[in-house]
Amino acid sequence: MKIERGYPTYTVTPKAENAIVKGHPWVYDAEILNIEGETANGGLVDVISKKGRYLGTGFLSQQSKIRVRLISRNANDRFDEAFWRRKLQWAWDYRKSVMDPADLDACRVTFGEADAFPGLTVDKFHDLLSVQVLSVGMENLQDLLLPALVDILRRDGQPIRGVFLRNDVALRAKEGLPQGKGWYPLPGETPPDSPVVEIVENGVKYLVDVENGQKTGFFLDQKYNRRAVGRLAAGKTVLDCFTHTGSFALNAALGGAAHVTAVDVSESAVEMARANAERNCMSDVMDCVAANVFDLLPQLEKEPMKYDFIILDPPAFTKSRKTVANAITGYKEINYRAMKLLPRGGYLATCSCSHFATAEKFEAMLRSAAHDAGVQLRQIESRQQSCDHPILWGVDETDYLKFYLFQVV
């Protein structure tokens, strides 16, 4: 029997009810039929069907098209400190259960909706936490959540020194939240002197700048895909395109590649990749080049240098359904060029981090590129984001990374 909690009730359309029943945690503004009661922005509301069936409780976002983000489907939950601490502990215990202890040095601790913390991303980089808050509900709770999470991690032997807020993202404006970044003031503690920390992933050392690095500082979702590349790289001449700070290239070098060329259009990224190569004593086998991959790949067809392993890890070419067609064109161009460069027996690692470029669309693009390049591909494996970025069934938005390893036959 549902306890009386006094939250406002939001009656939703049958379409929204169906989505919620199937596991989706969002209610859009256009799906709300009736509202009874009031609460502040970021406050809790109960969501019910037209027939009065309780569907869940979530945070109200008055300025967002995603008007309610569910956090519970239990009508008797009490949303006190103990509730949130249990959820944080559950999220950390999940990572411990699916990852080797060494992989916990750098991992995602909460992945938004996949962990029922809508709009909250927490990445752990050795002894620093990098946090991004994209919903008003989580913003209102951060003074409860962040100290509690630090306490949970410290009690488990993780020496957390500080928490850095990476709220310098435009998406916050849709929630009516200001942008900014800086150290979160843990009660009674002095923030660390530097936002730069060393992590070790797959045996590779990286310097991560949680203040100035992309997103939260480093892309953790390719952890095991990088390992898969390293496993096949022995003796190969490798071209790593869109290298960013050199992570795939370094895994290939550590895996015994004969030579690696790491390419990125960003001069600063190339400098960081070069520094990471030096840090791992890989400079003798790894060259870092600043170039536009779209221009470079056609040029390489005319060069004597040949590669037998090409890695394509581009940034998201689309962040909306409206631009998917253009994105697919871009993906096809670089994959076609890479396939043309590879000899028989060569390897191709290719991926997309865009949710809107679905696996079906991406695979169709790869078939078309292979046909046009006159090659046949043998799939070694297909992969997704690492398990600390779990895919929650019923929430398609959590399923975004596609990664394929092929051999040209």
List where the protein language model places each region.
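C-terminal catalytic and target-recognition region of SAM-dependent MTase-like enzymes
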Residues: 333, 347-409
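Mobile active-site "lid"/loop adjacent to the S-adenosyl-L-methionine
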Residues: 307-337
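S-adenosyl-L-methionine
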Residues: 268-311
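Conserved class I S-adenosyl-L-methionine
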Residues: 235-244
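Non-catalytic substrate-recognition/targeting regions of SAM-dependent transferases
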Residues: 110-123, 142-218
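Conserved SAM-binding loop of SAM-dependent methyltransferases across substrates and taxa
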Residues: 245-258
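Conserved SAM-binding motif I beta-strand of class I
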Residues: 259-264
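Non-catalytic accessory regions of SAM-dependent methyltransferases
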Residues: 1-126
